[in-house]
Amino acid sequence: MKRILFTLAICLIAAISYGQGNKGSKFIDFTVKYDGKEQKLSDYVGNGKYMLVDFWASWCQPCRAEIPGLIKIYNKYKGENFGVLGVALNDKPESSKKLIETMGIPYPQILNAGNQVAYLYNIKGIPEIMLFDPSGKLIARGLRGPYIEIAVKKALEAQDSQKK
């Protein structure tokens, strides 16, 4: 009997966590406190524009490799109902700030996000780059390299065709 209950509990936990951060799901809000301030994901996502969210860390070489491309995408599309947000996971805020300054990252950042954020979005590795629609629905995740801009361009074009 205990084995059956244990198995059912594991299945229930798996079922609940399956929906976390999956394509088509609404964003899961979180709050991060740092330097006397609170920042929420909802300060950026679900506010009427497409948001590309990069979960990263300064010590992560693949994260660093994606940043120049993200900066180009941000600069290219920032006037088109689009924005980029960085969320530094499991990183010392001082290290995050140093990298932001060194690389000249122009888009906003949420610093000092910990494991709870990775858990909320079922993030297994970084960088984890996600695209949310204007209502805050997750429309793409696991974006890397040229596929980031392809997803952004496709979303913005779909939005433009709906306006016509």
Residue ranges, per PLM feature:
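Thiol-based oxidoreductase modules, predominantly thioredoxin-like and allied folds used
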Residues: E80-S95, I105-G114
